[in-house]
Amino acid sequence: MSSAQRVVITPGEPAGIGPDLVVQLAQRAWPIELVVCADGALLTERAAMLGLPLSLLPYSPDVPAAPQPAGTLTLLPVSLRAPAIPGQLTVENGPYVVETLARACDGCLNGEFAALITGPVHKGVINDAGIPFTGHTEFFEERSQAKKVVMMLATEELRVALATTHLPLRAIADAITPALLHEVIAILHHDLRTKFGIAEPRILVCGLNPHAGEGGHMGTEEIDTIIPVLDELRAQGMKLNGPLPADTLFQPKYLDNADAVLAMYHDQGLPVLKYQGFGRGVNITLGLPFIRTSVDHGTALELAGRGKADVGSFITALNLAIKMIVNTQ
């Protein structure tokens, strides 16, 4: 990077491991400025529990970004609504979590931050607080007024994007329409080029049905919907291979010649990726007007404040965000 950049981090659920992981991030120097949108006392208390040094530096958007020294974080303060006790969810803090996400998102939209990295939230407690919340992806899509976003998870070796996300199985076949596939593949192709620096992305596309429909004997969605869309997009120059049976696609024969996989639904593509690299994976939201990465795990309430949480996924998410910033410059 030609000059230091500034990214914003949201720790997520205050009773979970998110604050622990953010404190652990601070134990090394970073070539970018890490602005944490959180309650300062929460981070200080959690650092003391973990026995780790932490100094909080004031955030000033008018001061040029600078590399982050080890043992420090730059604080963009948002106040807790109630005390946060490790491992104990508090409905009163649901609005706090949403406020951190909103402030971080708005900062990316107005150019304050080059990327957003999110820690794990607890969707249930946010909804229990009376705030409808499906997840980070949908929240940022709505707040940024993005036309459409695509969820992609990645490890060092594998990228898997999803045509549909949090839908029950009985609804998926109806959701796989030509319009949806055109939109999802266009976003995936565009962001692989612009945010990952891949000049001509090669995308493997899963079929929907077992054996990719077996020529129509196990479902006709491939023949009626998926194949016509892929043919149209290939004619435009996209490098698409599929539809392929999901049970044989995830092997070196195919993956060695691909930059990403498009799965038709959540549990078709993600079990393979998480088996291969759980704890090292990153969740990326494609289609947003800014870079957003996230850890691939939950709040792990039982580990909060105990010094046993693994910071690996957070480090990977932050490093990937840095690479994506470089690719977009």
From Swiss-Prot:
GO cellular component assignments: cytoplasm
Keyword Metal-binding annotated: yes
UniProt enzyme class: oxidoreductase
Binding residues for substrate: H136, T137, K274, N283, R292
Catalytic activity: 4-(phosphooxy)-L-threonine + NAD(+) = 3-amino-2-oxopropyl phosphate + CO2 + NADH
Main localization, broad class: cytoplasm
Cofactor: Zn(2+); Mg(2+); Co(2+)
EC number of the protein: 1.1.1.262
Cofactor, free-text remark: Binds 1 divalent metal cation per subunit. Can use ions such as Zn(2+), Mg(2+) or Co(2+).
Keyword Acetylation part of the UniProt annotation: no
GO molecular function: 4-hydroxythreonine-4-phosphate dehydrogenase activity; cobalt ion binding; magnesium ion binding; NAD binding; zinc ion binding
Localization annotation: Cytoplasm
Pathway(s) annotated for this protein in UniProt: Cofactor biosynthesis; pyridoxine 5'-phosphate biosynthesis; pyridoxine 5'-phosphate from D-erythrose 4-phosphate: step 4/5
Any one biological process term the GO annotation gives: pyridoxine biosynthetic process
Residues reported to bind a divalent metal cation: H166, H211, H266
Protein function: Catalyzes the NAD(P)-dependent oxidation of 4-(phosphooxy)-L-threonine (HTP) into 2-amino-3-oxo-4-(phosphooxy)butyric acid which spontaneously decarboxylates to form 3-amino-2-oxopropyl phosphate (AHAP).
Note: The active site is located at the dimer interface.
Oligomeric and partner information: Homodimer.
Family: Belongs to the PdxA family.
Protein name: 4-hydroxythreonine-4-phosphate dehydrogenase
Source species of the chain: Salmonella typhi
GN (gene name): pdxA
